[in-house]
């Protein structure tokens, strides 16, 4: 039950990250994922898995190409936190190499 709650939390942020071009909104959405995926408590573990299962990793990796430093910084920190999960770390590497 709790795991589905985290999917519902993640989806709006991923929607914003994939459909928005406003740098402030992108920075805020990436920052939210960054904060939610930090630490080792169970909800953060679930958030990291939810971002992966909702195909959010390629969205975040693509945003590293933006020319707005504060967006890139927020995205990079979110990816760092998501990479605490070993499977995410592997996928982030694969996605980056394939781009």
Regions found by a protein language model. Name each.
Residues 14, 45-46:
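Leucine-rich repeat
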């Amino acid at each position: 039950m709790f795991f589905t709650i985290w999917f519902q939390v993640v989806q709006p942020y991923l929607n914003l990250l994939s459909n928005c071009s406003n740098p402030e909104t992108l920075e805020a959405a990436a920052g939210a994922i960054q904060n939610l995926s930090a630490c080792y408590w169970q909800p953060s573990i679930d958030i990291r898995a939810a971002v992966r299962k909702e195909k959010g990793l390629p969205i975040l990796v693509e945003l590293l190409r933006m020319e707005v430093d504060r967006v890139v910084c927020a995205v990079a920190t979110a990816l760092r936190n998501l990479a605490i999960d070993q499977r995410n770390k592997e996928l982030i590497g694969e996605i980056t190499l394939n781009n």
